[in-house]
Amino acid sequence: MENPHEKDQSDALARIISGVSKLNSSIARVNEIQEEVYSRNLNLSVVSEIMQNYQASVDYYLRESGAMKEPFKNDD
């Protein structure tokens, strides 16, 4: 005897499989974007470190050469 619910179960399973496939696609795209964001953040981190080292070098040079001046104050 044939299962009376087999067609409904088969249709439901097909919809689930289709939904999971779309979900996997979406997650793959999110992962790609996340990798791109991580890469850009890493680049920003490197630039930030370079700028901090440069600032430390400038501060050291100005202190050692006696050329460091007080910051400008605006008395408006």
From Swiss-Prot:
It holds the Pfam family DASH_Dad4. Keywords: Cell cycle, Cell division, Centromere, Chromosome, Chromosome partition, Cytoplasm, Cytoskeleton, Kinetochore, Microtubule, Mitosis, Nucleus. Its main location: nucleus. The keyword Cell division applies. It is found in: Nucleus; Cytoplasm, Cytoskeleton, Spindle; Chromosome, Centromere, Kinetochore. GO terms for biological process: attachment of spindle microtubules to kinetochore; cell division; mitotic sister chromatid biorientation; protein transport along microtubule to mitotic spindle pole body. The keyword Chloroplast does not apply. Component of the DASH complex consisting of ASK1, DAD1, DAD2, DAD3, DAD4, DAM1, DUO1, HSK3, SPC19 and SPC34, with a stoichiometry of one copy of each subunit per complex. Multiple DASH complexes oligomerize to form a ring that encircles spindle microtubules and organizes the rod-like NDC80 complexes of the outer kinetochore. DASH complex oligomerization strengthens microtubule attachments. On cytoplasmic microtubules, DASH complexes appear to form patches instead of rings. Component of the DASH complex that connects microtubules with kinetochores and couples microtubule depolymerisation to chromosome movement; it is involved in retrieving kinetochores to the spindle poles before their re-orientation on the spindle in early mitosis and allows microtubule depolymerization to pull chromosomes apart and resist detachment during anaphase. Belongs to the DASH complex DAD4 family. This is DASH complex subunit DAD4. It comes from Yarrowia lipolytica (strain CLIB 122 / E 150) (Yeast).
